[in-house]
Amino acid sequence: MEPPRGPPVSGAEPSRAVGTVKVYLPNKQRTVVTVREGMSVYDSLDKALKVRGLNQDCCVVYRLIKGRKTVTAWDTAIAPLDGEELIVEVLEDVPLTMHNFVRKTFFSLAFCDFCLKFLFHGFRCQTCGYKFHQHCSSKVPTVCVDMSTNRRQFYHSIQDLSGGSRQQEAPSNLSVNELLTPQGPSPFTQQRDQEHFSFPAPANPPLQRIRSTSTPNVHMVSTTAPMDSSLMQFTAQSFSTDAAGRGGDGAPRGSPSPASVSSGRKSPHSKLPSEQRERKSLADEKKKVKNLGYRDSGYYWEVPPSEVQLLKRIGTGSFGTVFRGRWHGDVAVKVLKVAQPTAEQAQAFKNEMQVLRKTRHVNILLFMGFMTRPGFAIITQWCEGSSLYHHLHVADTRFDMVQLIDVARQTAQGMDYLHAKNIIHRDLKSNNIFLHEGLTVKIGDFGLATVKTRWSGAQPLEQPSGSVLWMAAEVIRMQDPNPYSFQSDVYAYGVVLYELMTGSLPYSHIGSRDQIIFMVGRGYLSPDLSKIFSNCPKAMRRLLTDCLKFQREERPLFPQILATIELLQRSLPKIERSASEPSLHRTQADELPACLLSAARLVP
């Protein structure tokens, strides 16, 4: 029997605390929750269950009245239960085990599942695959859920649930558009869907772990993800029925059948069916491990919209609107202009986020997370300074040549880092370069090929995107399927250098945008180098000319650009402090020779 799910739909805010309720939890644990008016049992026990790796969907709650247990619905109001005792038990059909931890040295690249830091010496559960540092052991869920025995049946049987009353709750039945657009009968259902984590469907049968101490088990399902109790019940029943009908083919001889395992808790040292499998080659195992991810890493970087507060609209660009927001401090939130994203766009966007989340550089805006509901949005650090465009063309800030060259060096350094990560900016311009806390350069709005590409249904269109003044000729012509390259970023960087060395924008004498596009694309128009400052070094002038070459093969790449600017900086004349000792604060006695002072002391 499964208890009713979900709290009552109510728009009222929870009021003050009125009492407490004592709750007995699985694994002989207990807690005390605060009773608040307007809250349900579901809401009150939500945090206590999640920190223990449990979920309301796989548990049932009872009221303890005169020593007898009475089933209670999760949507029952908590206020009338003030002073009573509740008991939470795990559903019988949910296969739970205790952790089986072993000490392990990870010779291959591994990261802790909790602090996400590099892991070399640590511990690993041989049942569910959790790996962690010793100091992270307090964060490990107490209960271990082993889905390896019925995961294959889960995917084959998921289609049979399409006619059930809870079809909309099956993870595999949710389309991407439903995930991206909030919809549902109640606000609470919408809030729960934001935290829902669906199991990734594998292309091949799941690879069971071969008992070894050389590689971690990266394809086990985590216990912290919410699980649907009806799916687990259906899976366990169908698996046990199928195994009995095949007469033992479903499990190796000498090992406990999945049906017997699902009816109770396994021993920590019980053997898995995978132990009887023949060892496969290391190469084949690595291929399968790549196909079967243990957990989508984007799960840790997607931010629920309810946690982000938009404060002020900063501006609107070619690909979205930037807001100042609050999320654990001041952040910049860029809401991207993607109306009704398709499944292909959603997957491409998430793939890009996996690349951007690994960017860490002093000259790059820090990527902090992303959102997919109700639309695409990116969260980055908040930069207090203004953009380079504002300094040069609005505020008319005066920089000396040494400062201009240093800004150019930092910009080249940040772009060199992005290109080393195989990230093409596609929209480098002075508006996307910020001067943070003085003259520290921060490059923003990088990557985002999914958003910066025009789409027609599921296929990208071959149309130029970006700002015209910083657009290379090959990007304007769009003769190649993908004209964006490292060299197209170099051209845009050349235009930024032109702004630094002239203090003005190129083509300011031409008012027609279409005329600029036509003439630059044909090679008839290029920035006027006669406007460069007279004190600009010759090496910088040559570099500027090379970056603005019409043929992209003739443009240098950022490692060469950075080396040129660093060499130029070292060759600039500097006013160095004298190595001699200053004599500004000497007393008159200090100027006397030492021999005279010693002679004076000898006089009686």
Swiss-Prot record:
Keyword Repeat attached: no
GO MF, any single term: ATP binding
Comment on bound cofactor: Binds 2 Zn(2+) ions per subunit.
Bias-annotated ranges (Low complexity): 252-265
Limits of the RBD domain: 19-91
Residues bound to Zn(2+) 2: 112, 115, 133, 136
UniProt catalytic activity: L-seryl-[protein] + ATP = O-phospho-L-seryl-[protein] + ADP + H(+); L-threonyl-[protein] + ATP = O-phospho-L-threonyl-[protein] + ADP + H(+)
Region (Disordered): 177-222, 241-288
Transmembrane stretches, start-end: none
Residues of the active site: 427 (proton acceptor)
Keywords: ATP-binding, Kinase, Metal-binding, Nucleotide-binding, Phosphoprotein, Proto-oncogene, Serine/threonine-protein kinase, Transferase, Zinc, Zinc-finger
Enzyme class: transferase
Biased composition, class Polar residues, residue ranges: 210-222
Mod. after translation: Dephosphorylation by the SHOC2-MRAS-PP1c (SMP) complex consisting of SHOC2, GTP-bound M-Ras/MRAS and the catalytic subunit of protein phosphatase 1 (PPP1CA, PPP1CB or PPP1CC); this relieves inactivation and stimulates kinase activity.
GO CC annotation: mitochondrion
Binding site for ATP: 314-322, 334
Modified residues (Phosphothreonine): 181, 316
GO biological process: negative regulation of apoptotic process; regulation of proteasomal ubiquitin-dependent protein catabolic process; regulation of TOR signaling
Zinc fingers typed Phorbol-ester/DAG-type, residue spans: 98-144
EC numbers: 2.7.11.1
Family under the similarity heading: Belongs to the protein kinase superfamily. TKL Ser/Thr protein kinase family. RAF subfamily.
Subunit structure: Interacts with TH1L/NELFD.
PANTHER family: SERINE/THREONINE-PROTEIN KINASE TNNI3K-RELATED, SERINE_THREONINE-PROTEIN KINASE A-RAF
Protein name: Serine/threonine-protein kinase A-Raf
Organism: Mus musculus (Mouse)
Phylogenetic lineage: Eukaryota, Metazoa, Chordata, Craniata, Vertebrata
